[in-house]
């Protein structure tokens, strides 16, 4: 399952929508909830990012992300 993780680069400042960035993770999980938990844990273990939201991408949404040219899987 591919998850899109929205985050701020630092936990030091209050989140601002203008500074929100995203990364994509391929997570092996039995359910959407388990995938979200694994994604959050993975990001928190490998970065200092402030995770705002984690979204499971549907096939159509994933196709759209690939078409826009911003899609790139992140590996830790």
UniProtKB/Swiss-Prot annotation:
Keyword Metal-binding: no
Catalysed reaction equations from the record: RNA(n) + a ribonucleoside 5'-triphosphate = RNA(n+1) + diphosphate
Keywords, alphabetical: DNA-directed RNA polymerase, Nucleotidyltransferase, Transcription, Transferase
Enzyme Commission code: 2.7.7.6
Record's keyword annotation contains Cytoplasm: no
GO MF term set: DNA binding; DNA-directed RNA polymerase activity
GO biological process terms held by the UniProt record: DNA-templated transcription
Enzyme class: transferase
Pfam families: RpoY
Domain of life: Bacteria
InterPro entries tied to this protein: RpoY (IPR009907)
Cellular component annotations (GO), alphabetically ordered: DNA-directed RNA polymerase complex
HAMAP family: RNApol_bact_RpoY (MF_01553)
Record-stated family: Belongs to the RNA polymerase subunit epsilon family.
Subunit structure: RNAP is composed of a core of 2 alpha, a beta and a beta' subunit. The core is associated with a delta subunit, and at least one of epsilon or omega. When a sigma factor is associated with the core the holoenzyme is formed, which can initiate transcription.
Function: A non-essential component of RNA polymerase (RNAP).
Protein name, as recorded: DNA-directed RNA polymerase subunit epsilon
Natural source organism: Streptococcus equi subsp. zooepidemicus (strain H70)
């Amino acid at each position: 399952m591919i998850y899109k993780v929205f985050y701020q680069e630092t936990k030091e400042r209050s989140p601002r929508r203008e500074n929100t960035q995203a990364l994509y993770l391929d997570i092996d999980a039995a359910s959407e909830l388990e995938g979200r938990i694994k994604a959050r844990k993975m990001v928190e273990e490998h970065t200092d990012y402030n995770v705002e939201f984690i979204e499971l991408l549907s096939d159509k949404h994933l196709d759209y992300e690939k078409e826009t040219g911003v899609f790139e899987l992140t590996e830790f």
